[in-house]
Amino acid sequence: MTQYYLSKNYNVLNNAGNKAKTDIEEILSKLGYKNAGLPQTTYSNKITGFLITLAGVLKVLFTISANNVVVVQYPFKKYYSFVCNIIHLKRGKVITIIHDLGTFRSKKLTAEQEIKRLSHSDVLIVHNNRMKEWMESQGYTQPMVCLEIFDYLSPSVNNNTHEPNQKPIKVIYAGALNYRKNKYLYSLNDVMSKWQFELYGKRFEEDKIKDKTLFKFKGFVPSDQLIEQVSAHFGLIWEGDSIHT
C-alpha cells in the first residue's frame, strides 16, 4: 500500500489558510507520503492556477492504484468530489483533512450539501469533538478522527517574556480585522478597557473604534516573523460577530 497526498497551486502563501495546507504537505512528505499530483506551485494568476491544479487532479488517474491511500485537504473547491471519485475509480481510499466547513465560513453550502460532499471520503480528520458531534448530528456516518490542536511549522523562536503582574495586560490577535468579518473586535471597549490589544492583519477599520487607546494596529506580518517578534501575555484565536458567543 502506497500513501499519497495531493498538492495544488496556492495563489498566495502568506495567509493562514494556505500556510496550514502547505505545512500539512510538508509533514506528510517527511512521513513518506508521495505527491499524487503535480508539484506545489504559487502562481497568482487565477487561470494558470486553475489549469495547474486541474492537471494535478487528472494526474491522480495515472499515479495511484488499488489499495493506495490519498490524503486530500478540504475545502478543495470545485475539485473535491471529482478527485474522490477518481481515487475510488482506481479502488483507492480517501482520507480528508478538514480546514473549514463552507456551511459556517462562507455559508455557500447547506449542511445537507456539505455532508453529501464529505461522504465521498472514507475517513475524515476533523478539528475536535464538537465538530465531530456536529457532523454526526447532520447525518455523517463515515469514520472520523479528531486532530485537536492545529499548529504551524516554523523555524522561528520567540524568547520574549512577560511578568504575570506587568501592566497593562497585553493580548495579541492575528487574523481578519475588518468589521464585517470580526464585528466582536469593535465591541471589546465595553468589557476590556484595562487591557491592550495588539492587532496583526489587514483592513482594520479604526474609525469604528470608540477608544483607540485600547488597540495598537501592527499591520500584516508574515507568520514566521510574527512568531518571532510578538510580545504579550496572551494570544487570542477567535472569529465572530459577538463578544457573547
Residue ranges and their predicted role:
Residues 155-224:
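Conserved catalytic-core segment of nucleotide-activated headgroup transferases in glycan assembly
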Residues 122-136, 140-158:
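Donor nucleotide-sugar binding/catalytic pocket of nucleotide-sugar-dependent glycosyltransferases
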Residues 7, 31-47, 198-204:
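A short beta-strand-loop structural module common to alpha/beta enzyme folds
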Residues 6-22, 180-181:
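A short, glycine/small-residue-rich beta-strand->loop->alpha-helix junction that serves as a flexible
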Residues 46-122, 126-133:
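Extended catalytic core of nucleotide-activated donor transferases of GT-like folds
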Residues 1-14, 40, 236:
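Nucleotide-activated donor-dependent transferases that construct or modify glycoconjugates
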Residues 224-245:
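Nucleotide-sugar-dependent
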